[in-house]
Every structure is written in C-alpha cells, then in structure tokens.
C-alpha cells in the first residue's frame, strides 16, 4: 500500500460527526481533528473484497485519490489525507458546507447575467486547473458545483469519482456521467477528451439562464437523441431577456465535433465572461436570467427526485413482503427466525436506512440485490435531507402514507 496511506485508526485522530451525504459505495461524514479542532469532510469508501460485487474497486479508489492529489486551486475541493482500513478507504477532504450553487440561486429574487457569468467564470477557472493537469472531470452537473460555506459565493468543484488523466494519445471511450449533461461523444461511444467537460458547461449555463434543460427528453433514449442531433433552441419565452453574448457563449459549446468546441481558455476569454468593450459589459449588466422559470425548474427537480425515492421505497417494501410470503411457503421450519429478520428489514427500509445483507432469500442473487440497494440508498438519503430541510417530524415511513408539503406537485 502507498506509504502516504495512514494505517492507524481514523478515530484516533478525528471525531466523527453527522452524515453529510451518501453515494455509490460511499458515505460522507463531518469530522473534527482532535488536536487542531479543524473541521473536514471524511468520505468513507467501502472496498470491494475478493470476487464480490459490493464496494468500489481499489484501483478506482486510487485513481480518484491520484486525481485529487493534483488539485491545488481555490475553486476545487482539496484532499487533506487518506486512511486505509480493512473495510474502507477514508478520504479526508476540505469541508464544503454552502450547499449547491443552484439551490442558492433559486432563493434569490433576481440575478443579472453579470452575476451569473461570475459564477460560470469560477467554474471555468476550476476546470482550467483540471485541464492544465490533463484531467477531465466527466461528471460536471449542478450537484457537483457547491459553495464553500453559507456566507460565501466561492464555488468549489467536487466529486472526482469519474475523473481521470487523459491526453491526445489516449483512446478513452466510456458511457459515464449524468444523461442530460453528457456530450455527444459519450452517447456515441467515441473517444473522450477535455472538450467533453466543455459541453457540460454549456448545459449548466443554459439551465442557469433559462430554467430549462436543453436536451432532456421524456425518456433516456429521447435525451440521447436530442444530444446527438443537437436538438435544442433558444425559446423566445425562456430567453427573451437573455443577451446575444450569452447565447453565443452557449452555442460555441454545443458543437458536436469536440475539436471545434470551445476550450476552457476560449470560454474564459469570451466577451460574456471577459468583456473587452463597454457595450459588452452593459449588455451583461442589463440582461437578467429567467429567475421565475429557474425556481420552477428547481421545484420540479426536487419533486421528481422525491417521488422517485418514494416509489423506490414502496417497491422495495413490497419486494420484501413478497419474499416473506415465499419464505413462509418454502420453509416453515425457519418461519419464526426469518419473520423477525424481515420485519426488522422492512422497518429499516421505511426509515431510509437498511442493510443490503439482510435482503437475501432463496432464488435471489444477494450481490445483485446489494447493487440495486447501493444505487437507491443515495436517493433515500437525499429525501431524508430534504425532509429535514422542510422541518417535518418523523421519518420516511410517513411519506409512504401521506407525503409532506414539499412533495406536493409544483405549480
């Protein structure tokens, strides 16, 4: 193991606090260094053991660590140190506690293009640091653009789980990222490059200005088709207050050929980001983003996330109940013990926290069960955070009967 991986018990040096979030095979918790009292975010990544399918591959964990070690920029999250245990690798990261940029903007009553372009500039400056180090992020989206703290407008790029070093000689082809933000070359399984990130910047900018996602379809296939066909426009109702400079900035990123797409340096020197004439600065200052539609976009996004999680909880609960019936018919000798186990499991699912190992039953692949649960658990975690944010008492089990106010459909 790399000598920079610390092997002593993590708790010897840190006090572990509340959960900050969860993802695939990982959970992030706030921690306090015992001596310095400095706060960090600790990312606990479960290691894949042997031939199992639960946990992250060690090579992927090391890849993420190596990328983070190259990072040293005000707009990119920094890695403090790494611990290795038998079950987990723990990344001690800079604490970023200001929430998502888009959530911050949705709380404002108005936002000029001048302010919007300042946020995009910070994203570009962080991205330039990556690209100068030949690193492509591959998962740029609003959820991975955070504010340092609640009193700051400093942006931090986070989540380098898909990031990798890349150069012109590499022929990297991979289907990765979040559908509505991925570039045409990802959909077509063509070589990826630094330009792949730039397409995502275009999507983020489009949404920020209009409150609408340019390529999102009713289905995944429709979204992919819209991306590869460049099926987007600047709808008058959405962009009537948008400057031509901003539209030009986006159009230079929505180019199918990656070699012709605007680079991070091109974008930083674009007049929408860096005005060279007074009229360009005035155009930015007088134009406004579509804040009403942006608020509606964020409300719809939260609604869809919430309803998806409620649906997943219901499906998982029904699945467990069905397995209980199957177990009863297949083995009356173990009826009592299995019923106790399943009742505990069902209770945990309703609370949004469950153990994948407790879902096994005859005729099912436990490894496959755990993969499904790992993917769905992060959605449940998001729902719990939103539930807390709305100041509702109780747990997720209540939403299965009567959805709280934040689950009411947006207008």
Short names for language-model regions:
Residues 16-24, 28:
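Protein kinase glycine-rich loop
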Residues 27-49:
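Glycine-rich ATP phosphate-binding loop
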Residues 44-71:
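Conserved N-lobe beta3->alphaC-helix segment of eukaryotic protein kinase catalytic domains
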Residues 81-82:
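A short, aromatic-enriched beta-strand patch in the conserved N-lobe beta-sheet
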Residues 87-100:
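Conserved short submotifs of the Hanks-type protein kinase catalytic core
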Residues 119-120:
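Activation segment signature within eukaryotic-like protein kinase domains
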Residues 265-350, 354:
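C-terminal regulatory tails of eukaryotic serine/threonine kinases
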């Amino acid at each position: 193991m790399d000598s920079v991986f610390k092997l002593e018990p993590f708790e010897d040096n840190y006090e572990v606090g509340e959960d900050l979030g969860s993802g695939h095979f990982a959970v992030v918790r706030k921690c306090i260094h015992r001596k310095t009292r400095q706060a960090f975010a600790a990312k606990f990544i479960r290691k894949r053991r042997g031939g199992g399918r639960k946990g992250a591959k060690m090579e992927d964990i090391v890849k993420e660590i190596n990328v983070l070690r190259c990072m040293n920029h005000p707009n990119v999250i920094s890695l403090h140190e790494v611990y290795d245990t038998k079950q987990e690798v723990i990344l001690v990261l800079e604490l970023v506690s200001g929430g998502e940029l888009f959530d911050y903007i949705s709380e404002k009553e108005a936002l000029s293009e001048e302010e919007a372009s300042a946020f995009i500039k910070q994203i570009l400056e962080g991205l330039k640091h990556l690209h100068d180090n030949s690193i492509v992020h591959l998962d740029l989206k609003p959820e991975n653009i955070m504010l340092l703290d609640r009193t700051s407008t400093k942006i931090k790029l986070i989540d380098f789980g898909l990031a990798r070093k890349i150069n012109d000689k590499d022929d990297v082809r991979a289907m990765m990222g979040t559908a509505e933000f991925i570039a045409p070359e990802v959909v077509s399984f063509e070589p990826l490059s630094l330009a792949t990130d730039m397409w995502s910047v275009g999507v983020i900018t489009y949404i920020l200005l209009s409150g609408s996602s340019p390529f999102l379809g009713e289905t995944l296939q429709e979204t992919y088709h819209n991306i590869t066909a460049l099926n987007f426009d600047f709808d008058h109702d959405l962009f009537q207050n948008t400057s031509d400079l901003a539209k030009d900035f986006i159009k230079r990123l929505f180019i199918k050929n990656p070699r012709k797409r605007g680079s991070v340096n091109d974008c930083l020197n674009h007049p929408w980001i860096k005005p060279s004439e007074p009229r360009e600065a005035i155009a930015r200052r007088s134009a406004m983003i579509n804040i009403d539609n942006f608020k509606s976009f964020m409300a719809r996004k939260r609604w869809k996330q919430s309803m998806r999680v409620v649906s997943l909880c219901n499906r998982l609960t029904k699945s467990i109940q069905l397995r209980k019936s199957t177990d009863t018919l297949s083995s009356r000798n173990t009826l009592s013990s299995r019923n106790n186990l399943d009742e505990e499991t069902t209770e945990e699912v309703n609370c949004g926290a469950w153990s994948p190992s407790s879902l096994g039953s005859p005729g099912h692949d436990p490894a496959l069960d755990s993969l499904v649960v790992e993917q769905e658990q992060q959605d449940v975690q998001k729902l719990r955070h939103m539930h807390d944010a709305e100041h509702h008492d109780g747990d997720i089990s209540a939403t299965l009967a009567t959805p709280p106010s934040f689950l009411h459909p947006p207008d």
